[in-house]
UniProtKB/Swiss-Prot annotation:
GO terms of molecular function: structural constituent of ribosome
Keywords assigned: Ribonucleoprotein, Ribosomal protein
Gene Ontology CC annotation, any one: cytoplasm
Signal sequence, renumbered to the chain: none
Pfam short name (any one): Ribosomal_S16
Gene: rpsP
Protein name: Small ribosomal subunit protein bS16
GO aspect biological process, one term: translation
Family: Belongs to the bacterial ribosomal protein bS16 family.
Length: 90
């Protein structure tokens, strides 16, 4: 089972709101997920992002792969550099 950290689209038409979830890669985008680890609202100015860092680090250590969009959100929040430093001992 390949696990991904990706965005699940919520909200109404033309007003997207995304939940950042951990899901099996075989499940559909808005299908069943394992755990919710944050959310992203692109409609606010500036964009509103809430991440549960401890849960995200836990899943990254277990081998979950973030999608490209989630990886960029994690990088902007500084989580990917902290994870990389912790993993490779800087």
């Amino acid at each position: 089972m390949s696990v991904k950290i990706r965005m699940r689209r919520m909200g109404s038409k033309r007003k997207p709101f995304y939940r950042i979830v951990v899901a099996d890669s075989r499940m559909p985008r808005d299908g069943r997920f394992i755990e919710e680890v944050g959310y992203y609202n692109p409609l606010t100015n500036p964009d509103e992002v809430k991440l549960e860092e401890d849960k995200i680090f836990e899943w990254l250590e277990k081998g979950a792969q973030p999608s490209d969009t989630v990886r960029s959100l994690l990088s902007k929040a500084g989580l990917m550099t902290r994870y990389h430093d912790a993993k490779y001992g800087k």
